[in-house]
Amino acid sequence: MRVATLPLASIRRPLERTLDEAKVARLMEAISRDGQQEPIDVLEFEGQLWGFNGCHRVAAIERLGLPTVQARVRRATADTLRMHLR
């Protein structure tokens, strides 16, 4: 596992999530004041990056117009990726 600064556009987010808008607003305030404190988790498979958590952090960062996100990147097998896509 490694922690990296990644372009938001490079992360595939295949699952639709329901956002708590109040939580996104609080995160926007905190991120603009203190920066991103907790990385999201990303799976890397065959050169592609897949994000399955951190939807509120990602939404806050996108709405702030920031181009990158801090992420813990873990290599994944095809089986691991399939499990997350269910």
Task: Locate the predicted segments by residue.
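Short, charged/polar connector segments at secondary-structure boundaries
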Residues: M1-R75, D79-R86
